[in-house]
Amino acid sequence: MTDISVSKIRNFCIIAHIDHGKSTLADRLLQDTGTVQQRDMQEQFLDSMDLERERGITIKLQAARMKYKADDSQEYVLNLIDTPGHVDFSYEVSRSLQACEGALLVVDASQGVEAQTLANVYLALENNLEIIPVLNKVDLPGADAEKIKQEIEEIIGLDTSNAINCSAKTGVGIKDILEAIVRRVPPPQDEIKLPTKALIFDSYYDPYRGVIVYFRVISGSLNKREKILLMASKKNYELDEIGIMAPDQQQVDELHAGEVGYLAASIKSVADARVGDTITLLNSPANEPLPGYKTANPMVFCGLFPTDADQFPDLRVSLEKLQLSDAALKYEPETSSAMGFGFRCGFLGLLHMEIVQERLEREYDLDLIVTAPSVIYKVNLNQQENIFIDNPSTIPDPQLRESIEEPYVKMEIYAPNEFNGTLMGLCQERRGVFIDMKYITTDRVTLIYEIPLAEVVTDFFDQMKSRTQGYASMEYHLIGYRKNDLVRLDVLINSERADPLTSIVHKDKAYGIGRSLVEKLKELIPKQQFKIPIQASIGSRIIASESISALRKDVLSKCYGGDISRKKKLLKKQAKGKKRMKAMGKVEVPQEAFMAVLKLNQ
């Protein structure tokens, strides 16, 4: 398979916002080059998880090799490296872009450029990729190709005079795209003589062969009889097989510079073969690895608890298995008096969190309770020490700390002009600091805010979409920690702290949140035989309180007339019993109550 010359190889990826038709376009390219037979074709061929097909998003990267006979009657090999389009997975995107020389920029001709597309285009420009603008869905009645071309020129500064109009659904313009890839995307550099370096741009776990690594050979060549060394994890392996994805795996003996392939080497866990790591030969290693490798750091944390305590071992096993294929997932065991045993998990972002939760419930058949998402806070203690805390209930008491710092993000929101006011209102509610506002075109605007990450991870995205009828899009990146007037808000039920409901809030918002929490709990906790106080507190100060009145048995029902002292005696005895019960009784908080409160405006 390696007899192809480097000048005939084209490596490209597709950049697009969610829903702009990237997966459908990939399907058409596979079909038109004859890579996938008509009868094997299914919608979104490269999105292998059910979850991806259902949500219509790409989570795991896939790669496919196509052969294409161009108009100059030469045969070319086109390697499509698929990229996820969501902000949580931007590190994966940057790695796939590093493995390419060109990119198709797919924009929906009826919707225009969106935030996520822009973020990825800038990444592509940083990697010096040749960008080919493609306007998709031109068959839709609302499509306005000329207006969108102008938008691309104004926002991104790309020349769109030779942009391609296409409709992936009907197959219009697919041939033009293939020709443009051959003509405009530069071939890889011919570096076969240099020491071997290959970039890992994806890996997944196969229960039979261990981790399967997708890589692009940057320089030198890789033979299946050699031992490899992974430069970041410092581990070495003997190769079991190497091959190409066409799009099913086919074994080959050797791959050289410029080619894209997969390898299996009995690697135990995805964490050993991280995205962005460099593969080199054990006997003649390269001097330095490829630049840009980062370990994935979780930004959002939450507790995962099984609804049934017996499922705890199953949850542990499932998380271990999931971590084999998802190196960005971090977890550690945690216990809570209200929820029992569970895990504290770290994720790249909200979408990542939802996907992990859904995969656990779907693929491993678990019922889970998820506590409210939180971020990592930096707590400055009195002795000039700093600690980082991801679980609000473990933050030290006010007398032991000087201040709490929280992570801030710089957020860019792209939206039509008419939603300007409502978006600015939303950002102000979420303690955003206004930085700048730019008009991209006459009717589209960019708002730039600096906002605490904690305000973004709850339901900012949903709110933004609902306030703008789905037209706004956003992207953000971390800019560091800042001091704020933050407090730990505890909820006490019958004078006991309920850990899962502890949160860190801004002092100005604490009363409103505390008030609504106790009112909601009052509705949801069933009455007991004794009175239950529910309180919201900051340190030792109670800021809001409600109580659930006791159920009472009518102890006087058997007294007909008679002396009043008899009745008093019975009532006194009942009151004494209630007092003892209150001192000893435990309040069982139903899980529905926790769920409802966690959903309550998190």
UniProtKB/Swiss-Prot annotation:
Its main location: membrane. PROSITE patterns: G_TR_1, G_TR_2. Its EC number is 3.6.5.n1. GO terms for biological process: positive regulation of translation; translation. Gene3D superfamilies: 3.30.70.240, Elongation factor 4, C-terminal domain, Elongation Factor G (Translational Gtpase), domain 3, P-loop containing nucleotide triphosphate hydrolases, Translation factors. Transmembrane segments: none annotated. Disulfide bonds: none annotated. Residues 7-189 form the tr-type G domain. The keyword Oxidoreductase does not apply. It comes from the Bacteria. GTP binds at residues 19-24, 136-139. SUPFAM superfamilies: EF-G C-terminal domain-like, P-loop containing nucleoside triphosphate hydrolases, Translation proteins. It catalyses: GTP + H2O = GDP + phosphate + H(+). InterPro entries: EF-4 (IPR006297), EFG_III/V (IPR035647), EFG_V-like (IPR000640), EFTu-like_2 (IPR004161), G_TR_CS (IPR031157), GUFP (IPR027518), LepA_C_sf (IPR038363), LepA_CTD (IPR013842). It is found in: Cell inner membrane. GO terms for cellular component: plasma membrane. One of its GO terms (molecular function) is GTP binding. Belongs to the TRAFAC class translation factor GTPase superfamily. Classic translation factor GTPase family. LepA subfamily. This is Elongation factor 4. It comes from Prochlorococcus marinus (strain MIT 9215).
